[in-house]
Amino acid sequence: MIEKLRNIAIIAHVDHGKTTLVDKLLQQSGTFDSRAETQERVMDSNDLEKERGITILAKNTAIKWNDYRINIVDTPGHADFGGEVERVMSMVDSVLLVVDAFDGPMPQTRFVTKKAFAYGLKPIVVINKVDRPGARPDWVVDQVFDLFVNLDATDEQLDFPIVYASALNGIAGLDHEDMAEDMTPLYQAIVDHVPAPDVDLDGPFQMQISQLDYNSYVGVIGIGRIKRGKVKPNQQVTIIDSEGKTRNAKVGKVLGHLGLERIETDLAEAGDIVAITGLGELNISDTVCDTQNVEALPALSVDEPTVSMFFCVNTSPFCGKEGKFVTSRQILDRLNKELVHNVALRVEETEDADAFRVSGRGELHLSVLIENMRREGFELAVSRPKVIFREIDGRKQEPYENVTLDVEEQHQGSVMQALGERKGDLKNMNPDGKGRVRLDYVIPSRGLIGFRSEFMTMTSGTGLLYSTFSHYDDVRPGEVGQRQNGVLISNGQGKAVAFALFGLQDRGKLFLGHGAEVYEGQIIGIHSRSNDLTVNCLTGKKLTNMRASGTDEAVVLVPPIRMTLEQALEFIDDDELVEVTPTSIRIRKRHLTENDRRRANRAPKDD
């Protein structure tokens, strides 16, 4: 049985098609009934993942093909979710690197591939989308080889098999000129090149928990790969946590994977990836083992957080109107629940009972958490993301990121100038000969906060930007990436009126239209100059009975700017907050009245 088992992780950059590839592998292996209605993008299970087209949580699926059982674990591509990636690598024996036949390998793939090499895994490279116009598979293979060399791959890892595929059409082949009619070459490559798990079948049971799931019916579900021995329902086991404390428990159900379903099994053997219920409170990296042989496996390491922000109770005048959960206790309970499976997250209580400091791997990591909370009915206010400085050998250090930008040549100058002002160092410049340039930078993380939206405007939406955490290094002196413009602040509470907004359009760009509810201290637009301006957007037109009301010109408003959560977080300054509720995202000053703001500006800065 063990010789027929294969465990493999899939690595791919956002939008290179790994989720579609898994769909097709499932359909063609007969794991899904071909007549059954197949759901698209099966691996991206939560709404946020489907909307953004990114994978956040690592997920498992299993395929049966010609008596072989292939466990496939999907990995998140973003370094922000590096905590997930670490754990996946401890469960598999090889990685499937999916690369777009036009784009080539991207920095996010680099991050995950580096982790895979550190675990000594050998890759299989899948060049996907070979049918797309402009595909250049040979160039991509060279790029992948160069990437592997840069990551210090061993000779064995550099001798990798290549499979060409078009996941959308469900075909693969060993040569991009000569494709088979289905995915068989890819299944064959997995079976031939992935080693069977190197495990001890006869020893006492031992496994490490590398993922957690929660189900209100059975409680916490621990997922991991059995290192040695066998496990069956109702077996007595001992659990060792990361501090070495032990406790006894009884296994409830043992669930294996088939397709996307979890199916109950009576016996699971070493090498297989299973889910176990009934073990009570579990943590990532706990070891579950036989009661007679209590041996802990080495703990899984997870990268430290690099960005933090404050989650505060919503104190605006509209507090409680739109959300169900608004108190500090509810917010803290929700954050503690998130800590159970989100291992790269840290939550600290502050002196202020209504504010919590939440640290994570990056802006994306934290904004995904905020978006999830908002959908669950929470109301909260969040501050601007700040990077976490460290003291190393008496020197203050800050995080740096590798950034890859792909821009049209006409925008190259302005982008390079902007990154120069944000203290970025150009490492590599690579024109593709077709009017686009790829730029590689190393830049302090704080220089990137707020840069994405500016970059999109600069390149008229045609630029691509990817970043991954690189390392900690000495702090560069000076401020980075401060907002140039001031803001327009409402001076009262009520409904915004078109007549008043029309008069404000010359002052800057507005965030809201006619009829929107506003309150004092809410930011309603960007000022065209660098200072903040308190304005009145509530006054209607004075009507007299001297004139017919129809003779005046119609008021025409420019459509307002609608900000997403990420854009709002990038936009705000240190004295501002983003108010997040289930139905709206508003930006406000930390001090709502003008008197309070003046008083705060006079107070000495304690930074």
Curated annotation (Swiss-Prot):
Changing residue 472 to P: No change in growth at 20 degrees Celsius. It comes from Escherichia coli (strain K12). Crystallizes with 2 superdomains; the first comprises domains I (residues 1-202, also called the G domain) and II (203-302, also called the beta barrel domain), while the second is composed of domains III (303-385), V (386-482) and a BipA-specific C-terminal domain (CTD, 483-607). Domains I-V are homologous to domains in EF-G and LepA; although the domains are similar, their relative arrangement is different. The structure of isolated superdomain 2 is more compact in the presence of Mg(2+) than in the intact protein. Very poorly to not phosphorylated on tyrosine. Phosphorylation in vitro is strongly activated by proteins present in pathogenic strain E2348/69 / EPEC / MAR001 but not non-pathogenic strain K12 / DH5 alpha. Phosphorylation in vitro increases GTPase activity. A 50S ribosomal subunit assembly protein with GTPase and nucleotide-independent chaperone activity, required for 50S subunit assembly at low temperatures, may also play a role in translation. Genetic and deletion evidence suggests this is involved in ribosome assembly at low temperatures; it may also affect translation. Involved in incorporation of ribosomal protein uL6 into precursor 44S ribosomal particles at low temperatures. Also has chaperone activity which does not require nucleotides. Pfam families: BipA_C, EFG_C, GTP_EFTU, GTP_EFTU_D2. Changing residue 164 to P: No change in growth at 20 degrees Celsius. Induction: Induced about 2-fold at 18 degrees Celsius (at protein level). Basally expressed at 37 degrees Celsius, 3.5-fold induced after shift to 20 degrees Celsius, maximal expression is seen at 2 hours (at protein level). No increase in expression when cells are grown at 43 degrees Celsius or when engineered to produce increased levels of the stress second messenger ppGpp. Expression at low temperatures is activated by CRP. Residues 483-607 are annotated as: C-terminal domain (CTD), binds A-site tRNA. Residues 386-482 are annotated as: Domain V. Residues 303-385 are annotated as: Domain III. This is Large ribosomal subunit assembly factor BipA. Residues 203-320 are annotated as: Domain II (or beta barrel domain). Belongs to the TRAFAC class translation factor GTPase superfamily. Classic translation factor GTPase family. BipA subfamily. The keyword Isomerase does not apply. HAMAP family: BipA.
